[in-house]
């Protein structure tokens, strides 16, 4: 399986990695069981970021089609801060085999920006070099929604604090920021037009 191949690759590179953890979940509405395997990666490898690999084995994630237009459909991008851009290129590009799609300096966004692509998700890295110990940290998450206005209305009706919908930085997008109930992780909703 893919997760076993990933574990074998890391072990072959001399990385001390644990064993798989089996998971199981039950859909309370349908009674359907779904199973998966997790492989937690050590902080010494991930440079302080809580990271694990997951492979779904059986069953499927429930689809709530009645609320689909007002729900998150997938993860769009993860924003990571680093003080060691070359180290993160080595980790994500060489060790994990994730494609570095773009490496550019954008002064108005804070410096060097790295964009890794994994399926339909982007790992956006904001690099600000300093002389401290290499460290990475999660800065934020961006979630794709089908209809941002319906999602906004649903979240507001459920008591969450959400900014008004506006045009995104990326052309042909609408965005809103979830300001509450995010465990202090900056959280963006994005609709691609």
Language-model-detected regions and their locations in the chain:
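N-terminal beta-strand motif that seeds the catalytic metal site of vicinal oxygen chelate
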Residues: 1, 52-89, 139-141
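Short amphipathic alpha-helical linker/capping segments at the junctions of internal repeats
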Residues: 101-103, 144, 163
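Short, conserved charged micro-motifs
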Residues: 2-9, 86, 148-153
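Aromatic-anchored, glycine/proline-accented short structural segments
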Residues: 68-127
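Vicinal oxygen chelate
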Residues: 3-70, 114-117, 124, 156-193
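Exposed loop/turn and edge beta-strand positions of beta-sandwich/beta-sheet ligand-binding modules
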Residues: 110, 137, 172
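A short beta-turn/loop motif at secondary-structure boundaries
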Residues: 106-108, 131-133, 168-170
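A structural feature that tracks compact, well-ordered secondary-structure segments
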Residues: 54, 91, 114-116, 121-131, ...
């Amino acid at each position: 399986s893919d997760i076993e191949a990933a574990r074998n690759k890391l072990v072959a590179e001399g990385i001390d990695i644990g064993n798989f953890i089996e998971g199981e979940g039950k859909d309370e509405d349908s009674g359907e069981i779904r199973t998966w395997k997790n492989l937690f990666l050590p902080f010494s490898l991930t440079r302080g970021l809580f990271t694990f690999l997951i492979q779904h084995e059986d069953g499927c994630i429930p689809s709530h089609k009645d609320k689909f237009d007002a729900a998150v459909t997938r993860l769009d991008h993860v924003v990571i801060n680093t003080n060691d851009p070359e180290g993160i290129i080595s980790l994500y590009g060489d060790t994990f085999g994730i494609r570095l799609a773009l490496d550019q300096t954008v002064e108005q966004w804070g410096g060097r920006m790295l964009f890794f692509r994994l399926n339909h998700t982007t790992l956006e890295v904001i690099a600000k070099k300093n002389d401290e110990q290499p460290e990475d940290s999660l800065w934020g998450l961006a979630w794709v929604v089908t209809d941002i206005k319906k999602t906004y209305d649903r979240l507001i009706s459920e008591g969450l604090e959400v900014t008004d919908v506006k045009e995104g930085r990326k052309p042909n997008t609408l965005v809103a920021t979830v300001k509450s109930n995010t465990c202090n992780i900056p959280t963006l909703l994005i609709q691609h037009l």
